[in-house]
A protein has these predicted regions:
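Short, charged, surface-exposed hinge/linker loops at domain edges
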Residues: 1-12, 45-80
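Short secondary-structure boundary micro-motifs
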Residues: 17-21, 41-42, 48
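Short aromatic-glycine-(Arg/Gly/Cys) micro-motifs in beta-strand/loop hairpins
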Residues: 12-30
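A short, exposed loop/beta-hairpin motif centered on an aromatic-Gly-Thr core
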Residues: 31-42
Length: 80
């Protein structure tokens, strides 16, 4: 379930090239989840790492996590 959620969220990521020729990526509805790296691949990898940490912290603190492609992670806490 977690892997599916991460993959679905990463499919929603948006990237752009900044004026300094670095890549910026973010995922809409995931406040604070963004990355800025020299290459697109590095930006994707960093964005996924940030997303993973954001999810873990959110679950631990009981925060609302957005539903992605019908997947809800907040149910994990309810089941535990």
């Amino acid at each position: 379930m977690l892997t599916s959620y991460i993959r679905a969220a990463m499919r929603q990521a948006q990237y752009k090239i900044l004026e300094d020729n670095t890549f910026y990526g973010e995922i809409q509805n995931f406040v604070g989840v963004y990355a800025n790296e020299d290459t697109l691949e590095d930006c994707r990898e960093e964005l996924q790492e940030v997303l993973e940490g954001w999810i873990l912290l959110g679950l631990r603190l009981g925060h609302y996590l957005p539903q992605v492609d019908g997947i809800r992670l907040d149910m994990v806490k309810e089941m535990a």
